[in-house]
Amino acid sequence: MARLFTPSESKYYLMALDAGTGSIRAVIFDLEGNQIAVGQAEWRHLAVPDVPGSMEFDLNKNWQLACECMRQALHNAGIAPEYIAAVSACSMREGIVLYNNEGTPIWACANVDARAAREVSELKELHNNTFENEVYRATGQTLALSAIPRLLWLAHHRSDIYRQASTITMISDWLAYMLSGELAVDPSNAGTTGLLDLTTRNWKPALLDMAGLRADILSPVKETGTLLGVVSSQAAELCGLKAGTPVVVGGGDVQLGCLGLGVVRPAQTAVLGGTFWQQVVNLAAPVTDPEMNVRVNPHVIPGMVQAESISFFTGLTMRWFRDAFCAEEKLIAERLGIDTYTLLEEMASRVPPGSWGVMPIFSDRMRFKTWYHAAPSFINLSIDPDKCNKATLFRALEENAAIVSACNLQQIADFSNIHPTSLVFAGGGSKGKLWSQILADVSGLPVNIPVVKEATALGCAIAAGVGAGIFSSMAETGERLVRWERTHTPDPEKHELYQDSRDKWQAVYQDQLGLVDHGLTTSLWKAPGL
């Protein structure tokens, strides 16, 4: 690749825009992958009155927030805009943006938008009830969160928007467009629309034709790390970057997070522990799960895909437990100057493995085709306060998260025949040393913890550097920049104990799903169209 930019004696930096479900961040890195500064703002997605499950993305307000974050990051870093060598954007997957033929963004929804439940059900009936299977085999996605039912909903209920729509992109692509005026999507993020072929890494318009939808709205596809354009004069005035700064194609948050963790080779495995836990295994070539339990997404590394099995609301469940039951521990932790989770882990470390048999019922393993969960509960409690208390319940939650993670990894192994020899644990969950050790003991695998645990923005910055010609290869740079904090080695005796706990939990969870099926309890979450 020709070098578009050559660092001189002066110090240059890369900027990553990270558009998550709950916030937007502008993060500045130096060329060695060190985070220099960040600007961050929370955003909320709007429920439309009388549209159940809707979660619209406020294009005008959120662009203003993104610009504020870029200015804030530059201010916090204390550097002039001309020292930003390139910028790229990543975002939550599944969120889509529509544009009219003049290039004006006219409608967008967030990843969690579930308004199209009826359309999902209708689409499943197409082709003698085989349409969803056809979508999955080609794209690795089911219909529940794909773009197809959302577009059909617009055709049914907002025909004014549907008729105007000229182009579709993802939210990361929208940020790049607002900076540069250039429209394109990348495979890693666009792959979650259910419209992108895993093998060709390009659109499969026949799927829209089958659904009776327009196929003329598909934008150009460019690989992550490709130079898209430059920051326009108009955008520069708003965001504080210098006009002419290279804008580089970004991607999906999980895939770029894996790049930032150096998870770039076939069979490498990561557990990303945030609000959701993603269990991700790199596959050398596209293959899908015959049981349709696991989603398959394009990696940002061309030719490679990722099998991804998701645990639902894992981080959110821990936060609920802390906020609902641990007010005393929050006060004690504040006085001690430590994080509440650190105190709770210290308490939980005195509870024996297995947590006295307590079984949390929250997320199931992923069942992508029929994705729903049991009602949240704790099973097999004791009224002995020495055995059943906050420390026990907290440890049980950490153990259960690891058990669900192991189940998710197992079902990936079942269809891919890839059995990892170690895994990378990142995200907020990996800050917990007890949790990391429990994950090693439950999975039976060495667990490696990186120094940079929130690696999505770093992966995005690497893509920016490749597009600007600073780095020659995304994979090589990801491997070079990742640094390791610690490794947790599994204990064979505890692994055997947790195998028994896992078997019991799976049997109990099936019974709990039966209560939901009979309308006696309420599911933690149910996919649209079920």
From Swiss-Prot:
Reaction it catalyzes: (S)-4,5-dihydroxypentane-2,3-dione + ATP = (2S)-2-hydroxy-3,4-dioxopentyl phosphate + ADP + H(+)
InterPro entries assigned to the protein according to its UniProt record, in alphabetical order: AI-2_kinase, ATPase_NBD, Carb_kinase_FGGY, FGGY_C, FGGY_Carb_Kinase, FGGY_N
Stated family: Belongs to the FGGY kinase family.
Main subcellular location: cytoplasm
Record keywords: Cytoplasm, Kinase, Transferase
Catalytic activity, EC: 2.7.1.189
GO MF term set: autoinducer-2 kinase activity
UniProt keyword annotation of Transferase present: yes
Record-given protein name: Autoinducer-2 kinase
Any GO CC annotation of this UniProt entry: cytoplasm
Gene Ontology BP terms: carbohydrate metabolic process; quorum sensing
Reported function: Catalyzes the phosphorylation of autoinducer-2 (AI-2) to phospho-AI-2, which subsequently inactivates the transcriptional regulator LsrR and leads to the transcription of the lsr operon. Phosphorylates the ring-open form of (S)-4,5-dihydroxypentane-2,3-dione (DPD), which is the precursor to all AI-2 signaling molecules, at the C5 position.
Cellular localization per UniProt: Cytoplasm
Pfam families referenced in this protein's UniProt entry, alphabetically: FGGY_C, FGGY_N
Taxonomic lineage of the native organism: Bacteria, Pseudomonadati, Pseudomonadota, Gammaproteobacteria, Enterobacterales
CDD domains tied to this protein: ASKHA_NBD_FGGY_AI-2K
